[in-house]
Amino acid sequence: MRTKLSTCNVWFPLLVLLVWNPARLVLANIQEDEAKNNITIFTRILDRLLDGYDNRLRPGLGDSITEVFTNIYVTSFGPVSDTDMEYTIDVFFRQKWKDERLKFKGPMNILRLNNSMASKIWTPDTFFHNGKKSVAHNMTMPNKLLRIQDDGTLLYTMRLTVQAECPMHLEDFPMDAHSCPLKFGSYAYTTSEVTYIWTYNPSDSVQVAPDGSRLNQYDLLGQSIGKETIKSSTGEYTVMTAHFHLKRKIGYFVIQTYLPCIMTVILSQVSFWLNRESVPARTVFGVTTVLTMTTLSISARNSLPKVAYATAMDWFIAVCYAFVFSALIEFATVNYFTKRGWAWDGKSVVNDKKKEKGSVMIQNNAYAVAVANYAPNLSKDPVLSTISKSATTPEPNKKPENKPAEAKKTFNSVSKIDRMSRIVFPVLFGTFNLVYWATYLNREPVLGVSP
């Protein structure tokens, strides 16, 4: 018995291997045959779909309007150019429509195809109305996707990079907000032939990737969608519009423009505290601050398009320029009255000297006339001549000469204009800043959105 059991234990695994290996080979062959059959079925379905198919004709020609459902997924938004008034956007652009000619029956419900099939069927002639430049990505192969359902519904997706126009109104710059549109529609088909419809609700038809913002100077507040019809000489066309709402960040401009302007105005007001006789110092303050404001105003305009109206920053710079220039005019006024005071002291001293010289000359002339009149009589009368000699011998007592008063080098007191300016200028400039920032920072952004 033991011998028989050991013999069975040896032969049983061999029998299992002999039976399993052929079965496994048969299953593999069956699966391979099924794969070949599927490939053959796919090929036959595609050949049958394209047999007699004319991609020059739209679906439902002569019977119904072709409805194209669209949605957009934004992978990258930005940058935005203020000078060119344009922005760059990278999207997955998706379109879905139904073509009865592409219905099929088979073991699968969806045919997943690449871009080679897209060139053999009809696709919408969609273009971007406000696009300056559009690029379809082709590395390493054209980035296109095509799916055909058994009921003839097609999904066509492509990756695009679009440079589009973004009209900007810069009256509130740099506290401004903008709505950049992306408009697209059919180039050749009117509303009676092809119409566009958003696939989902407004919040889902246009989506932006969480890390898709490429903006340094803006915040992307959100997006909205719309639809409109435009008329032209060739008919009416459907235009789909997606608006991207942007709010400018003010931090860069505060550091680069606003703070330097404020510091320049404060520096110009330091001259009110200098002595009004310090002409060189106050002149340097005034001229330097005026030139600095001129440079700041020029540099602030370099980052903006050449618009014909004044922006909020222009108004701020203009007021700062007015304060700086007024400080220079204030010094000129103070200096003018200071010069008149010094000139008056000098004239009074000169006039006193002239009066003293005139009185001395008058006394000398009177004495000379008296001597000339009595000279002949003295020579005839010996008594008078003796008296005259005795009278002329002693020298008259000289009166001590009064030294002319020297010009007093007095220092002018603080000008009343300077005293007033020390209070008026800072108060006015502070009030202006309060009104300016309260007005623009609390203003709701106005976004121009077309219907």
Curated annotation (Swiss-Prot):
Instruction: Cite the post-translational modification comment.
Output: Glycosylated.
The entry summarizes how activity is regulated as: Activated by pentobarbital. Inhibited by the antagonist bicuculline.
Q: Which residues cross the membrane?
A: 250-270, 281-300, 312-332, 421-441
Question: In which residue ranges is the amino acid composition biased (Basic and acidic residues)?
Answer: 396-408
Keyword list (alphabetical) reads: Cell membrane, Cell projection, Chloride, Chloride channel, Cytoplasmic vesicle, Disulfide bond, Glycoprotein, Ion channel, Ion transport, Ligand-gated ion channel, Membrane, Postsynaptic cell membrane, Receptor, Signal, Synapse, Transmembrane, Transmembrane helix, Transport
Keyword Signal among record annotations: yes
Which domain of life does this protein belong to?
Eukaryota
Which ranges does the record list as Cytoplasmic topological domains? 333-420
A GO biological process this protein is involved in?
Answer: chloride transmembrane transport
Enzymatic reactions: chloride(in) = chloride(out)
Tell me the disulfide pairings in this chain: C166-C180
Tell me a GO cellular component.
Answer: chloride channel complex
Q: Where, subcellularly, is it found? A: Postsynaptic cell membrane; Cell membrane; Cytoplasmic vesicle membrane; Cell projection, Dendrite
Q: Which GO terms describe its molecular function?
A: benzodiazepine receptor activity; GABA-A receptor activity; GABA-gated chloride ion channel activity; ligand-gated monoatomic ion channel activity involved in regulation of presynaptic membrane potential; transmitter-gated monoatomic ion channel activity involved in regulation of postsynaptic membrane potential
Q: How does it sit in the membrane?
A: Multi-pass membrane protein
Signal peptide coordinates:
1-28
Instruction: Indicate which residues are glycosylated according to the record.
Output: N38, N114, N138
The domain comment in this protein's record states: The extracellular domain contributes to synaptic contact formation.
Q: What biological function has been recorded for the protein in this entry?
A: Alpha subunit of the heteropentameric ligand-gated chloride channel gated by gamma-aminobutyric acid (GABA), a major inhibitory neurotransmitter in the brain. GABA-gated chloride channels, also named GABA(A) receptors (GABAAR), consist of five subunits arranged around a central pore and contain GABA active binding site(s) located at the alpha and beta subunit interface(s). When activated by GABA, GABAARs selectively allow the flow of chloride anions across the cell membrane down their electrochemical gradient.
Q: Which family does it belong to?
A: Belongs to the ligand-gated ion channel (TC 1.A.9) family. Gamma-aminobutyric acid receptor (TC 1.A.9.5) subfamily. GABRA2 sub-subfamily.
What is the protein's name according to its record? Gamma-aminobutyric acid receptor subunit alpha-2
- What species was this sequence derived from? Rattus norvegicus
